[in-house]
């Protein structure tokens, strides 16, 4: 029987997707990071694990004469990603993809799938540890030529995880190479924008959304009672996000008639007044190896013409009320000071002049007026981030096979570096149906 090899990244998302498609564990899993191997072993105990540099694993010895049906490669993407910015890059790390050529030469996998960031096609020589713009893509073309020289047909595309059932817009580059004479196949999207005819007509399911991944039972503490006040940049993000996704939204997303949530990015500034955030009823933007997302909740209560009358006991579910103190005045002061102002100001300073708006923090929900009575914020949990990547809800992320706990930072890092499992499942089903179980893709 043909075996499956995964030179995986992060928490083992490709292995998970492959398992969902085939109904079996990958046979060989390779990663240099002990923490990544520990998480993989906890979830895929039947795999043979190599905690080594990919160049130190002998493909012939590892396979032991068994034919390879699929070899998956997720070489480190940090030194290709635009998120790297203008920082110097390392030639050795950028060259990790060449290990796929070694496997093609020595054990000739029937199908090779390589995953990376979209900038992978710009792979070229370096000058002073920076990409040489005059030779952009030169090394990538050599890489493709090497695969073809060993008898592989090659094709590549960029895909979005939300189109295959993951509640994130994460975009990735995929290269498929095969040497069995069969055609390379790209999976058809299963999900789409809910406003398009493809979805309204029933051809596709609607994108899964960020709202699905959030545990609404976790408290969201008030931004006004924190021991350490939030910095001005974060306050501006919150205010701009509330303005765009709640106050100015004709149809704000409301949870159980009690709160209006949104997500903000906790780092990464944009110029001007651009909002670094998103509505909760869209797929999550790309999650990286650090937790950049803050859940902001505007607690709302019915607004009466005579003014705000109650802190609203109904806000206790599904998120417990932040405090019994009336924060209405603080909410109004906050919105006045940070309502899209370019610089903003501290809440301890005198209020800016209130201009044309008579009321701040009023939200219209299905024709009824509500008022924001408090604002909470918390970071997304590692479990929520794994949910956004499309991992199964029972995927073990907080401990290894021996029960040793991982810190949250390690959990988030494994998540951000992982392949969303729905990608791998869809690609394997499209190209290796003979190895797959008969059920359709499980991504809802």
PLM ranges: what are they?
Residues 1-4:
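Extreme N-terminal starter segment of soluble prokaryotic enzymes
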Residues 8-12, 415:
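Class I SAM-dependent methyltransferase "Motif I" SAM/SAH-binding loop
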Residues 11-22:
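Conserved SAM-binding loop of SAM-dependent methyltransferases across substrates and taxa
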Residues 26-28:
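Short beta-strand element of Class I
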Residues 33:
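Conserved SAM/SAH-binding beta-strand->alpha-helix loop
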Residues 38-65:
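S-adenosyl-L-methionine
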Residues 59-70, 77-327, 332-346, 352-353:
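Class I S-adenosyl-L-methionine
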Residues 372-408:
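FAD-binding beta-loop-beta segment adjacent to the flavin cofactor pocket
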